[in-house]
From Swiss-Prot:
This is Small ribosomal subunit protein uS13. Located at the top of the head of the 30S subunit, it contacts several helices of the 16S rRNA. In the 70S ribosome it contacts the 23S rRNA (bridge B1a) and protein L5 of the 50S subunit (bridge B1b), connecting the 2 subunits; these bridges are implicated in subunit movement. Contacts the tRNAs in the A and P-sites. It comes from Halorhodospira halophila (strain DSM 244 / SL1) (Ectothiorhodospira halophila (strain DSM 244 / SL1)). Gene3D superfamilies: 1.10.8.50, 30s ribosomal protein s13, domain 2. Part of the 30S ribosomal subunit. Forms a loose heterodimer with protein S19. Forms two bridges to the 50S subunit in the 70S ribosome. Keywords: Ribonucleoprotein, Ribosomal protein, RNA-binding, rRNA-binding, tRNA-binding.
């Protein structure tokens, strides 16, 4: 298996699809990384030579991904909660942040319904 950014990417998949298994790299970014590294995106990872894998590593290193990205997102949410702004309060209360209605929906964000016995 090829190891890029501390992640073992699947060898049986095409290069661009395998790159999407890294947190922070989606389809568009994976294709642009393959183009910048000069790697044909439709070639499977097991068929890449060491130079191509190293070129992919170099290109992936230019982006904020994996642990750094997760930490950055968590710090952004924590900053909103510390500020006490509307979005921070919604995060703190576990409610939808982006203006969705909550009277009837938002079950994913609010969690399962509690019956009268558990209140």
């Amino acid at each position: 298996m090829a190891r890029i950014a501390g992640i073992n990417i699947p060898t049986h998949k095409h290069a661009w699809v395998a790159l999407t298994s890294i947190y922070g790299i989606g389809r568009t970014r994976a294709l642009s990384i393959c183009n910048a590294a000069g790697v044909p995106h439709d070639r499977r990872v097991r068929d890449l030579n060491d130079a191509e894998v190293e070129a992919l590593r170099q290109e992936v290193g230019n982006y904020v991904i994996e642990g750094d990205l997760r930490r950055s997102v968590a710090m952004d949410i924590k900053r909103l909660m510390d500020l006490g702004c509307y979005r921070g309060m919604r995060h703190r209360r576990g409610l939808p942040v982006r203006g969705q209605q909550t009277q009837t929906n938002a079950r994913t964000r609010k969690g399962p319904r509690r019956g009268p016995a558990s209140r």
